[in-house]
């Protein structure tokens, strides 16, 4: 069973927890009824798209679409998708990424763990996560106490993708 909360953006999570418990259970059942992990992850993305449309959430649909493309990656688009994803949540030239996209990083880690090790998808995801390990996490708005904890959690998520391992 997939715990979906780490894979949800903060905006979606905020709206999700306001739903009645029966609606939350419906979404979780819909996600978990899929037999394959990849299908479950696709359903998590579909749920987020639904919430983005319903609550008019900005910025996230682009990241969600890129994650869906990474699930279905082919050889011609691997590098371009990796660059597009890095640019969507950070800046490759500055070596930074925004902590508000912790959910997207957690999603990629989950997807990597459920990919064949030598597949194009696994190789592309490993490259993205390896880059992020060496990037500096930044906040979109003023720093707050929670972001220090979030930065540490992200570093722990990314540690297996560092070159030293």
Where are the regions that the model predicts?
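Residue-level signature of the C-terminal ends
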Residues: 88-92, 111, 131-135, 161
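Boundary/linker elements of alpha-helical solenoid repeat scaffolds
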Residues: 62-67, 85-96, 137-142, 152-155
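Conserved hydrophobic register position within alpha-solenoid helical repeats
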Residues: 81-85, 121-125, 154, 165
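HEAT-repeat alpha-solenoid elements in large eukaryotic scaffold proteins
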Residues: 75-89
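N-terminal "cap/leader" segments of large eukaryotic alpha-helical scaffolds
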Residues: 59-79
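Alpha-solenoid HEAT/Armadillo-like helical repeat scaffolds in large eukaryotic proteins
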Residues: 66-73, 110-112, 157-161
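Charge-dense, helix-prone N-terminal extensions
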Residues: 1-61
């Amino acid at each position: 069973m997939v715990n979906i909360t780490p894979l949800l953006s903060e905006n979606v999570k905020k709206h999700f927890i306001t739903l009645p418990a029966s609606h939350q259970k419906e979404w979780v059942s819909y996600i978990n009824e899929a037999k394959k992990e990849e299908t479950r992850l696709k359903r998590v993305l579909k749920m987020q798209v639904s919430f983005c449309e319903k609550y008019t959430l900005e910025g996230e649909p682009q990241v969600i679409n890129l994650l869906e493309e990474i699930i279905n990656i082919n050889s011609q688009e691997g590098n371009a998708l990796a660059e597009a994803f890095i640019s969507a949540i950070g800046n490759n030239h500055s070596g930074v990424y925004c902590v508000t996209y912790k959910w997207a990083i957690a999603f990629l880690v989950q997807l990597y763990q459920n990919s064949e090790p030598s597949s194009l998808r696994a190789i592309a995801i490993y490259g993205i996560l390896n880059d992020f390990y060496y990037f500096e996490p930044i906040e979109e708005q003023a720093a707050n106490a929670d972001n220090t904890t979030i930065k540490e959690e992200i570093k722990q998520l990314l540690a297996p993708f560092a070159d030293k391992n």
